[in-house]
């Protein structure tokens, strides 16, 4: 598996014959020219996870790609989209994608909680090869190989980021959702996640593929 980070929560997961793009949002850049996608997978409706303005062109460039999103998000998009419910199991190429969780993390008690799907991808080598939680601290009940772990968010303290990484305890982790952190301050967050866990933690260079 190769992972390419396009900033914030946008990650390209290339499994060889099957390629998935997660959360192409408005804080992410460089994904616009991607072709050959098998699927585009959206965790929830917030614009930093799905840029409705750039999505149609991305779909036009990838006519064979399915678009998956929760029902709330699907209803807001002006493009064909397959609605995903918690508990669904999707077959995309030689991959199995499971839809888990269901709810966005609480930002504030006065802000309504929206849908959020955490996606767990299995390949022929590992049933939980890669997990993208979106904006949620969902802890699966099985071992995860590579976790895209939120580094910072309006709905999360750094202590919660550390505790979440400890709770999931993946074999390896890569940080996402760092677009709200000034570049010069990101090392503070990454340092806590590295020093306070025993996880193999790797920061992905933007727009460069890394093999796992």
Give the location of each predicted region.
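Binuclear metal-ion centers of metallo-dependent hydrolases, dominated by the metallo-beta-lactamase
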Residues: 1-4, 78-89, 162, 166, ...
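Structural motif
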Residues: 20-21, 41, 68, 132, ...
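Short internal beta-strands
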Residues: 63-71, 172-179
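Conserved alpha/beta-hydrolase "acid-adjacent" motif
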Residues: 49-52, 157, 183-184
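A short acidic, amphipathic alpha-helical/loop segment
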Residues: 53-61, 160-164, 189
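Active-site metal-binding motif and surrounding structural segment of the metallo-beta-lactamase
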Residues: 27-69, 145-148
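Core dinuclear metal-dependent hydrolase active-site scaffold
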Residues: 1-35, 83-143, 155, 160, ...
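Catalytic metal-binding/acid-base residues of hydrolase active sites
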Residues: 46, 72-73, 103, 137, ...
